[in-house]
Amino acid sequence: MSIAEKIKVLIVDDQVTSRLLLSDALTQLGFKQITSAGDGEQGMKIMTEQPHHLVISDFNMPKMDGIGFLQAVRTNPNTKKAAFIILTAQGDRALVQRAAQLGANNVLAKPFTIEKMKAAIEAVFGALK
């Protein structure tokens, strides 16, 4: 069993199409345990019920944005060790710095390639195969 097959991934994005595209990309990389949520509140509920190893979250979402969700994950003792990647359409340096300060493992600009996503994940977990 590859590392990718063992990692539980949570995708959090308010756009259904984005969640589906990202899920397809992760499946191509060998991930099998993929869950998704439509916003940070729903994502946090999933994380507290069943922690995941990797969270990939959009930045701009209703109810709880990616930064708020990151803060919630990092302050919960049961979820704080999860790797966290934020996706953003905004090329905002302040966002990248804030995300890093709060413990994000990476911030990827949209649109991104599957190779960039793979590199961001491998930076945390090592080679996926």
Swiss-Prot record:
InterPro entries associated with the record: CheY-like_superfamily, Sig_transdc_resp-reg_receiver, ST_Response_Regulator
Co-factor: note: Binds 1 Mg(2+) ion per subunit.
Record-level GO BP terms: chemotaxis; phosphorelay signal transduction system
Subcellular location: Cytoplasm
The protein's name in its UniProt record: Probable chemotaxis protein CheY
Keyword Metal-binding attributed: yes
Protein species of origin: Rhizobium etli (strain ATCC 51251 / DSM 11541 / JCM 21823 / NBRC 15573 / CFN 42)
Positions of post-translational 4-aspartylphosphate modification: 58
Residues at which Mg(2+) binds: 13-14, 58, 60
Function, as annotated: Involved in the transmission of sensory signals from the chemoreceptors to the flagellar motors. CheY seems to regulate the clockwise (CW) rotation.
Cofactor(s) listed: Mg(2+)
Superkingdom field: Bacteria
A GO CC term attached to the entry: cytoplasm
